[in-house]
């Protein structure tokens, strides 16, 4: 039991280092993806090409989230594997899980992770949105106040986009202007995205793995990984766009709820808007896996345990 706990702590340490490193290295793609998703139809791409330093605005929020999420992931997944393991005599809970039980454990762990990172995702979105307000074209696209609230339009006070650059000032501003609700915006879309992520990734990976099972080489592994990432992004990008919009500083003035957000994007901006930022998200997803695995392996060796245990 002591050895199992020791291995778990080492896994958490290696996972945390890998998660923070991966988050930092791929954050420019996250910045560009989120920036594009926040833009209304017809906004020039150049709007989200500011100084290079802006590409890391909001990275601190995601790094804090990555650290906490990793701890939560290992502990939650370990507990779920133990609960779902039918063979109580087996100490290796993970290896004895069947495909469906493994999917259930992964999905539930993903939902718990999503609930944890929602406040940090909101902070990140606020910081990225505020980093773009220096661009004059963006300032012209503030919410329009309507005389009467309808499903198509929301009649409330327009919420100006504030200029915030640091993590703690962002938290303070969000609480003062929008209250505690500012940290849980986009919860519905985030949970649905996580469920879709887990199920689609599991299904797509299995399908591509079987399709290329005749080729037992490194190339087939790379192809399987890229194909899975492409499928994942293509099928979940609309939910990701809605999530970003619902987490924006002026979401409450523009959308009544998640369904209204989806409807207005479709009617006012067109179907293509649901796939905004997909190229940058694909780049991030494609690179993240390799970076995380490599760093995790190296830290595992330094800590003196097998990363495959």
Swiss-Prot record:
InterPro entries: Mit_carrier (IPR002067), Mitochondrial_sb/sol_carrier (IPR018108), Mt_carrier_dom_sf (IPR023395), TXTP-like (IPR049563). The chain crosses the membrane at residues 12-32, 47-67, 100-120, 184-204, 222-242, 285-305. Disulfide bonds: none annotated. Solcar repeats lie at residues 6-83, 97-211, 216-302. Keywords: Membrane, Mitochondrion, Mitochondrion inner membrane, Repeat, Transmembrane, Transmembrane helix, Transport. The keyword Transmembrane applies. Its main location: mitochondrion. GO terms for cellular component: mitochondrial inner membrane. GO terms for biological process: mitochondrial citrate transmembrane transport. The keyword Transport applies. This is Uncharacterized mitochondrial carrier SCRG_05595.
